C-alpha cells in the first residue's frame, strides 16, 4: 500500500508543535514583528499629523502615566491594589486586549494592579504575547476561569483556587493591607 495514503484517502501528516515554550516564544516573536497588538490611529491619521507638524503620542509615556494615576488613587483611598475584570479598565491599566466582547460578559480575564508592586495579568493560556508590547505588565499568569461554562461542577474548587491566588498577591504585595478595589466580577 502507498505510504502517502490511508485507505482511499491521502495521509495527513500530524502537526508536531514542539514544546510549549517554543510555541510561546514563536508567538511573541511573531506579535513583535507584526506589531499586531498595538491599536493605533492608522496611516491616514498619521499622515495628517505629519502634514500638520503634530507629533504622535508617546505611548510608553501614556502607559506609565495611566498606571501612575491608578496607583495614586489606590494609595489615596488606602487600597493594597485593584482587581480589574472590565476589559476597558484592563486596557487602560495594561494597554493589552484579548477578545474584548467575550470577556466583557464572561469573567475569564482579569488583572491585579498592586499599589506598591507588580501588575499581574491573568490571561488565557499562552497569550503572554498579547501584552509584551506595553511594557507595564510585570507578569502574566493563566486565568482561573470559575464561571460555570468552563468549570461545571468544579466551580466551587475553581472559585477557591482563584480566591487563594488573589489573596496570595494581596498578602505578598499589600504591605499588610488587605483592602482591594474591585471594578466588578
Q: What name fits each language-model region?
A:
Residues 1-185:
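A composition/biophysics-driven feature that prefers long, compositionally simple stretches
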